[in-house]
Amino acid sequence: MKTRTINISLILLFCCLFFSFNSSKRTNKAESDFITEIIKTRTKANPYYIIISKKSYELRVYDNQGWYATYPCVFGSNDLRDKYMAGDKRTPEGNFKVIVKRNNSKWKYELLLDYPNQSSYQKFDTRKAEGLIPRNAQIGGGIAIHATRPQEEWTVDYYQNWTDGCVSLKYTEAADLYSYIPVGTPVTIEK
């Protein structure tokens, strides 16, 4: 019981420090809810969470001990702004979770995210109301963390963004990630 209390305290401290020193973000209700979600989901069965940096082209995995692994990755288009609507080929930013692990016929290893979620819909509706996107635009979906095709790992080596908005890892590294990341793992995608 004492160890569990210490672990939860350390997780809380780490999350608070991470979000307070991240100058590009201000703590808000969505981030606070995400921290709470991380604490709820990080158990012995699922100690992981993922932070994806579009700026650094990195997917970082953390566990109860802190940093666990880093994988280079690529995204949708070279336009690294937040996803606005279906078809823009941008990778969405925000807090998500892995909802399905599946084998895709094109690249095998795929971790489907819960995009669009409530926060995604709020941003989408606001942008639509502000006239930033057409009234008939759709939000899109099917965003995942997945592998390249086996013969196309070079796309990651050369930071060649190629997906329709997903996050893509080298085939071999996606296989590694897929082997230990469970459904329910929290994922943050940031600029």
Stretches found by the model and what they are:
Residues 17-29:
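Bacterial Sec-dependent signal peptides at the C-terminal "C-region" and cleavage site
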Residues 92, 100-191:
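Exported/periplasmic cell-wall-interacting domains
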Residues 32-49, 54-55, 75-99, 126-131, ...:
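N-terminal post-signal-peptidase region of extra-cytosolic proteins
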